[in-house]
Amino acid sequence: MVELKIACKLDGSCEKPRYRKYKCKVCGWVYDPLKGDPSQNIPPKTPFEELPDTWICPVCRGKVGKESFEPLDEWVEFDE
């Protein structure tokens, strides 16, 4: 499940969906969904929640996976 944060105004118009950045608790590397992870063929605009279960931290390389990442209070928007 992808966690979205959407803000709507009283007139019914809504802002673009926003996606969280995640930080490795071991090395501090930040996964930015706007950039993806080219080292593992993860394209830009891939939300963290959609990364495969086999994905690993590109800095720790095999030492830690998704379970070692924590959500940050930093969000990015995807342009269509």
From Swiss-Prot:
GO annotation, biological process: alkane catabolic process
The record's free-text note on cofactor binding: Binds 1 Fe(3+) ion per subunit.
CDD domains: rubredoxin
The entry's keywords: Electron transport, Iron, Metal-binding, Transport
Domain Rubredoxin-like: 19-72
Keyword Metal-binding carried by entry: yes
Cofactors named for this entry: Fe(3+)
Binding locations of Fe cation: 24, 27, 57, 60
SUPFAM superfamilies: Rubredoxin-like
InterPro entries: Rubredoxin-like_dom, Rubredoxin_dom, Rubredoxin_ET
Pfam families: Rubredoxin
Single GO MF annotation: electron transfer activity
Disulfide topology: none
Function, as annotated: Rubredoxin is a small nonheme, iron protein lacking acid-labile sulfide. Its single Fe, chelated to 4 Cys, functions as an electron acceptor and may also stabilize the conformation of the molecule.
Family: Belongs to the rubredoxin family.
Protein name as annotated: Probable Rubredoxin-1
Organism field: Methanocaldococcus jannaschii (strain ATCC 43067 / DSM 2661 / JAL-1 / JCM 10045 / NBRC 100440)
